[in-house]
Amino acid sequence: MRIDVITIFPDYLNPLREALLGKAIQRERIAVGVHDLRNWTHDVHRAVDDSPYGGGPGMVMKPDVWGEALDEICGDGTGQVPRLVVPTPAGRPFTQRTAVRWSQEPWLVFACGRYEGIDQRVITDAARRMPVEEVSIGDYVLVGGEVAALTMIEAVVRLLPGVLGNPASAEQDSFSDGLLEGPCYTRPEVWRDQPVPEVLRSGNHAAIARWRRDQSLERTWRRRPELIEALPEGTLDARDREVLDRVRESDHSGDSRSPGSG
C-alpha cells in the first residue's frame, strides 16, 4: 500500500517512522510520502490561507495551493488514482469498518487541513477524478488533520498482511465483530490480591472462548449499548441473549437499590 500525507507541518508525521508503522515501512508493507503543502505556494510568504468569503472568524486554506498539490501528487485521473481522505469534524464517522475497507485500497492520500478548513471547491474538484471521503474521528475539534490522519493510518496499516506479529490479534480486536473487546490479563497470577479469572487458567479453550464472548457482550452493553442495537439480525445466539438479559437485569436491580430511589 502507498500512503501520502499533505500537511503544512511535515514533522508532525514523524511518528509514522516509529513502532509498528516504522516496521511496516522497513518491511516494505507500506510506502509513505509526507509532503509540505507550502512547496506549492508562489509568494514570498508561502501563504496557504486567506480570509473567508461571507466573513466570520479564522482563515480558510486556499484552493489554488491545494489544487496544485493534489494535481502533482494524485495525477490527472487518467492513470491509477488514490482514495483521497480529508479529516474534518464535519465528516462521516471513521469506524473499524472504514479501516477494513481502506485496507483493501492500493493507495491512500490524506489531506490535512488547518484553520477553518480547506476551501470546499478543492474537495469538489478532486471528486471529479478520484474517490474522496471527508471523515471524522470523533465529535470534537482538533487544531488540524494530522493527528486524525495518524490515527486512521495506524488503524488501517495494522490490518495489512504481515504487519502484526499475530494476525489473530486483529481478528479479536474491539469492533472486529461489532463488539468491544473484553478484559485481558497476564502474569503474575495474583497481583495486589486480585487473581486472574480461574477460567483463563483452566486450559479449557471452549470455556475460555465463551467467557471472552460473555465479557465482550457485558462490556459493550454497559459502555456502548448502541453497538448492540446496531448488530445485524442473527448475530446474537440464544446464549448471547441470555447473557445480555442477565446484565440488563443486574443493572436494573442496581439502579433500583441506588440512594434516593423509591
From Swiss-Prot:
GO terms for cellular component: cytosol. Specifically methylates guanosine-37 in various tRNAs. Its EC number is 2.1.1.228. It comes from Saccharopolyspora erythraea (strain ATCC 11635 / DSM 40517 / JCM 4748 / NBRC 13426 / NCIMB 8594 / NRRL 2338). One of its GO terms (biological process) is tRNA N1-guanine methylation. Belongs to the RNA methyltransferase TrmD family. Its main location: cytoplasm. InterPro entries: Alpha/beta_knot_MTases (IPR029028), tRNA_m1G_MeTrfase_C_sf (IPR023148), tRNA_m1G_MeTrfase_TrmD (IPR002649), tRNA_m1G_MTases_N (IPR029026), tRNA_MeTrfase_TRMD/TRM10 (IPR016009). Keywords: Cytoplasm, Methyltransferase, S-adenosyl-L-methionine, Transferase, tRNA processing. This is tRNA (guanine-N(1)-)-methyltransferase. SUPFAM superfamilies: alpha/beta knot. S-adenosyl-L-methionine binds at residues 113, 137-142. It is an enzyme of class 2 (transferase). Homodimer. It comes from the Bacteria.
